[in-house]
Amino acid sequence: MYNINIQEITIIRNRKPAMKDVNQELQWFGGSLGLFNLRDRDKSCFRIFVEMVKSARERQALSSDELAARASLSRGTVIHHLQKLMKAGIIVHERNTYILRVDNMRSLIDEIEKDLDRTLSDLRDVAGQIDRELYN
């Protein structure tokens, strides 16, 4: 497990896919985390995300060049999406390679939940401090 600070994550509540197709479920999963949008017409971020999930299962970190080859994308496109995935706290950069933050999807959600809990706790503390200053 890696220690990271999530800078930005979006949670979107969507209907779960009716079919039990792993690609649809991965698309829904990543979409619910705000990773994919309409601008990603060729599903490049999704393709990179899938490769990162596969590499996590194999416990193998990948370079941007390896990801570009696996996903049939330019290195520039890969790096753009890797930065987005890092900013969301989904992947980490380690020794010129990238890897999913944890080795499975459930653990990823557990880690994001812990990050959100810490952030909400900080917000609650500051809100209490603001209330005391405003109302005393």
Question: What kind of region is each of these model predictions?
Answer:
Residues 1-39:
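N-terminal leader segment of winged-helix/HTH proteins
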Residues 40-45, 63, 96-117:
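Short, cationic-aromatic polyanion-contact patches
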Residues 40-60:
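Short helix->loop/beta-hairpin flanking segments within DNA-binding domains
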Residues 61-71:
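A short alpha-helical element within helix-turn-helix/winged-helix DNA-binding domains
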Residues 67, 78-88:
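Basic amphipathic alpha-helical segments that dock to polyanions
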Residues 86-97:
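A short, conserved structural fragment
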Residues 107-136:
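Amphipathic alpha-helical dimerization/coiled-coil segments
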